[in-house]
């Protein structure tokens, strides 16, 4: 697959792979981490784990290997650029590991011809419990597929403009902000776009408004990817569980709760279209 073949919300699975005694021995030798927690049965019995466990970085290595074996970017990958990883549970000999991947962010390179693909990874055991998780970003070559849809590029100016166009044509949104004067910030991961609203109209879409956002509403990329592609938005439940956060004026945020609900619904509709501007 080339850069333009990916879509935010795409999901892939790989595995399973059973962890062996040989894995533990080889990774210990390779990493140099020979702490008795990994090498001594007697020592490990006295810990909360009860038996030797694999080094934490073993999971990230397995996840990378399972992803590579899918062969999706074998002919297009340029380089890995970034990784963030969290350990939730220990990995032990005998565990059956599988990988669940969601594409959560696509970012065009300035020079064209390639782009950054960020995926959210969950390494799971045989029961489906998440053992480790995290994001990984890679630079991937583009093919000749033409412009890439930006309808799921939350927080970019191109996405914001497409969203603003759809909101302007939505009577419920226009009514919800008919008397409001302010700026709504929408953040996806590290990307944020500002919608300047004046009495029912969105009069500007920008990366940063001169006076900042009245309030900013946002979530990690993986939450937006799930929200935009799920069968149901479950917006209220997501707010209650803290998947989304807000900053800025709390009064204005609460005042525009209905407008935000409409924004989410319109964003989900937009995610099903094919806007192909170049993301900003």
Which residues does each predicted region cover?
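Feature captures hydrophobic
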Residues: 144-280
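Short, surface-exposed secondary-structure edge patches
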Residues: 2-3, 50, 88-89, 235-236
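Hot-dog-fold acyl-thioester-processing enzymes
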Residues: 1-82
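HotDog/MaoC-like acyl-thioester-processing domains
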Residues: 1-7, 91-150
């Amino acid at each position: 697959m080339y850069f333009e073949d990916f879509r935010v919300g795409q999901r892939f699975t790989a595995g399973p792979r059973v962890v062996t005694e040989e894995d533990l021995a080889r990774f210990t030798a390779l990493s140099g981490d020979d702490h008795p927690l990994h090498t001594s049965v007697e020592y490990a019995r006295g810990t909360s784990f009860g038996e030797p466990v694999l080094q934490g970085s073993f999971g990230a290595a397995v996840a990378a290997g399972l992803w590579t074996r899918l062969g999706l970017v074998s002919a297009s990958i340029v380089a890995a650029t970034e990784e963030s990883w969290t350990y939730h549970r220990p990995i032990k000999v005998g565990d059956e590991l599988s990988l669940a991947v969601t594409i959560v962010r696509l970012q065009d390179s300035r020079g064209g011809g390639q782009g950054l693909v960020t995926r959210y990874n969950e390494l799971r055991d045989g029961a489906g419990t998440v053992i480790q998780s995290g994001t990984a970003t890679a630079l991937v070559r583009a093919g000749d597929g033409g412009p890439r849809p930006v309808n799921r590029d939350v927080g970019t100016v191109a996405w914001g403009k497409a969203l603003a166009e759809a909101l302007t044509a939505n009577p419920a949104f226009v009514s919800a902000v008919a008397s409001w004067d302010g700026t709504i910030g929408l953040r996806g991961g590290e990307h944020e776009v500002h919608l300047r609203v004046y009495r029912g109209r969105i009069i500007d879409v920008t990366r940063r408004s001169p006076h900042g956002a009245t309030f900013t509403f946002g979530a990690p990329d993986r939450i937006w990817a799930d929200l935009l592609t799920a069968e149901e938005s479950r917006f209220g439940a997501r707010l209650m569980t803290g998947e989304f956060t807000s900053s800025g004026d709390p009064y204005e945020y609460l005042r525009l709760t209905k407008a935000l609900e409409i924004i989410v619904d319109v964003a989900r509709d937009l995610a099903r279209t094919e806007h192909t501007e170049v993301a900003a």
